UniProtKB/Swiss-Prot annotation:
Gene3D superfamilies, per the entry: P-loop containing nucleotide triphosphate hydrolases
Gene name of this polypeptide: pstB1
GO molecular-function terms, A-Z: ATP binding; ATP hydrolysis activity; ATPase-coupled phosphate ion transmembrane transporter activity
EC class name: translocase
Biased segments, Low complexity type: 10-27
Entry function: Part of the ABC transporter complex PstSACB involved in phosphate import. Responsible for energy coupling to the transport system.
Protein topology in the membrane: Peripheral membrane protein
The protein's name: Phosphate import ATP-binding protein PstB 1
EC number: 7.3.2.1
Amino acid sequence: MTENEMTSNDSTEPTPTTETAASSPDPSGDPLIEQSIDVEGTDSTAAETGKPVIESSDLNVFYGETQALQSIDLAIPEKQVTAMIGPSGCGKSTFLRCINRMNDLIDAARVEGDLHFEGKNVYDADVDPVALRRRIGMVFQHPNPFPKSIYDNVAYGLRIQDQTENIDEKVETALKRAALWDEVKDQLDKSALDLSGGQQQRLCIARAIAVDPDVILMDEPASALDPIATSKIEDLIEELAEEFTVVIVTHNMQQAARISDKTAVFLTGGELVEFDDTDKIFENPESQRVEDYITGKFG
């Protein structure tokens, strides 16, 4: 859960300047949680039946008079990595930001259609976006650690949500999950700004997972990193999918092929052209347009 600047490579898509994911101390009062969504029960059912955890139906998004997404029908499975690829301005980051309602921060944005998380339409009037963002964390393109210590960065969301019992253990667990603990365990009081870019991004991932969300959204999480740091992030994403549903936007098709289970291909005009198992998308796509894009004939 972050509150810093959000950026995107999709130059035609407006981006919110801040994430207002502040939390109330008592999550029991949040409308989303009051919908009686049983996380454990839902997870079990989804795992047994393959029911999607996120599902859009005829989803359309506009920025003023410009349509960014056109009638998107997409079902994202639980505890897998789903990649979204496509040329700049195709709407993939717009879709990502719809999932936890980050587009609410753009005045000109308008959303039509349905987008369900665990069976509940996230755009229903009784859904609190702040409560939604507690369960759907986000990691941005550029690392954005707070100007605080490494420890305080990870503890930030826990303190806001009044989850301070055993906080040291929770911070350690999050850092271990993010494959950062061994590198920072003896310098938790060090400023997060002194970390390398790759370490900062893993710290942001630790901060996001510390509050134990159900879904992690990632918008180009490795685009600003060197190849070694990128490899660590990719390995981490595959590990995170054992516990979380991961949705990643990437311009790097090789990255999508390496780490994702499912791939959605968006093309110019905000159209979802194909969604399937990643191997099938890259080896035998149904759409000629998708094949042309993947082979570099356009886009």
